[in-house]
UniProtKB/Swiss-Prot annotation, chains A, B:
PANTHER family: DIPHTHINE METHYL ESTER SYNTHASE, DIPHTHINE SYNTHASE. The modification Phosphoserine is found at residue 171. GO terms for cellular component: cytosol. The keyword Iron does not apply. This is Diphthine methyl ester synthase. Pathway: Protein modification; peptidyl-diphthamide biosynthesis. It is an enzyme of class 2 (transferase). GO terms for biological process: methylation; protein histidyl modification to diphthamide. It comes from Mus musculus. Keywords: Methyltransferase, Phosphoprotein, S-adenosyl-L-methionine, Transferase. CDD domains: DHP5_DphB (cd11647). Its EC number is 2.1.1.314. S-adenosyl-L-methionine-dependent methyltransferase that catalyzes four methylations of the modified target histidine residue in translation elongation factor 2 (EF-2), to form an intermediate called diphthine methyl ester. The four successive methylation reactions represent the second step of diphthamide biosynthesis.
């Protein structure tokens, strides 16, 4: 049996009791670690689970899934995913390949950012399409996701923005030379995402277009959702450029306007104090 | 401290390890039981948690929250919610009231139908606004949610339909006479939801309007998501009228059209066999 097990969002104890029981009895336990991170590392998980974990990076899962499936028809193998196995990233490719090999599978769900974002008080059923904001480079500055934000807002829907993660990336030179040397991991902060968004707003204005959002649009920054030191800050997009949310992972919500009174009241619990609004400007 | 703890979707062991530790040390533990149900009852939860649970029905939470908050500033109180505390139903009203009383709170997240629905293979970020389908009566047959389905489909988005639950409802006579006698609980099935949807489609046609969906629209019925005996069936809306999914809870997804190839492939794992498509017709 192949078990796909969600780990939730915080630390080792956010696994479900059912998930933990499976992890402890499986013959091999893989940890997917390229789409998200927990606030604790692999070692803390290993200690709490009492099991060695095999790191499954992108290459492993995409190219060498055969290793994962080995003997999974006669023994139990677990594949651990931060959040839910079908949350922000879907692992349906693994399930499809297992099914073709005649290996049965079971999913053990958990919280993912897709539902835990509700902790800021915005109602989940008022969220439209989720978007991803990637790190810009000097030559690659995609803006296409902005159309989705625009469409969501036109329909009065909030937009959850998932922020880029670069884990186990090679520099161009190392890639060309075939050297398996990896850059330090990078995680986009709410500040960076807000700055890129403001550039897009300005680009729209420069082209004479009315941007879908402005510096004053109400946003919510979230950091380490589900962890002990979770931080939530509600304020304008401009404020999101300088608000201090600490360590990764960060997410950003662009509200859809016309908030429900209960949504407004919840967001007021997280509003950025006036004194902070010019920090670092 | 007030703890809001998600129980997940299946049985007693779907609580997180962190949640279980909190439940076992709290002075009082409430179980919210009017917006959803687990496949196991209160007794099974009590046995596994080793704690007595106080059922918190709608009246209790809306009118007598003071009981829940009693001494929560000096001791720990847990409020258990099937799924996630901010999933299909938000409990932000409890948090706002606690905050006003100076009671700190903490949320322990879990899977909810809002993210676990991803197990059918449809990608979560392609879901638009979630709708609720309520039981029709002879005199109350609301169709207004259908506009949201239409808007979602126009944008290529899937629609998660949450199906009505009637728990602890009084008959009109008992309500008038002030008798606290409750009707047996009722849970809408995928069959019933599909039949109501088909009536709406026919009403639109009768008014000369083009309905947003037809008998042939691809839908997904889900039952007891996260439980051992979970069932998923993909087929036309017409097939959803007769597909056999067993006990509650049921949910229905109306696809947005233009499925991603990976979505199609996943749905094919759950397609209703031809031979079943005329069952009961």
């Amino acid at each position: 049996m192949l078990y796909l097990i969600g780990l939730g969002l915080g630390d080792a104890k956010d696994i479900t009791v059912k998930g933990l029981e499976v992890v402890r009895r499986c013959s091999r336990v893989y940890l997917e670690a390229y789409t998200s991170v927990l606030t604790v590392g692999k070692e803390a998980l290993e200690e709490f689970y009492g099991r060695k974990l095999i790191l499954a990076d992108r290459e492993e899962v995409e190219q060498e899934a055969d290793n994962i499936f080995k003997d999974a028809d006669v023994s139990d193998v677990a594949f651990l995913v931060v959040g839910d196995p079908f949350g922000a990233t879907t692992h349906s490719d693994l399930i499809l390949r297992a099914t073709k090999l005649g290996i049965p599978y079971q999913v053990i769900h958990n919280a993912s950012i897709m539902n835990a974002v509700g902790c800021c008080g915005l109602q989940l059923y008022r969220f439209g399409e989720t978007v991803s904001i990637v790190f810009w480079t000097d030559t690659w500055r995609p803006e296409s996701f902005f159309d989705k934000v625009k469409r969501n807002r036109a329909n009065g829907m909030h937009t959850l923005c998932l922020l880029d993660i670069k884990v186990k990336e090679q520099s161009l030179e190392n890639l060309i030379r075939g050297r398996k040397i990896y850059e330090p991991p990078r995680y986009m902060s709410v500040n960076q995402a807000a700055q890129q968004l403001l550039e897009i707003v300005q680009n729209h204005r420069a082209r004479g277009e009315e941007p879908a959002i402005t510096e004053e649009t109400l946003c919510v920054g979230l950091a380490r959702v589900g962890a002990e030191d979770q931080k939530i800050a509600a304020g304008t997009l401009q404020q999101m450029c300088t608000v201090s949310l600490g360590e990764p992972l960060h997410s950003l919500v662009i509200t859809g306007g016309n908030l429900h009174p209960l949504e407004m009241e919840m967001l007021s619990l997280f509003s950025i104090p006036e004194s902070q609004s010019t920090d670092g400007l």
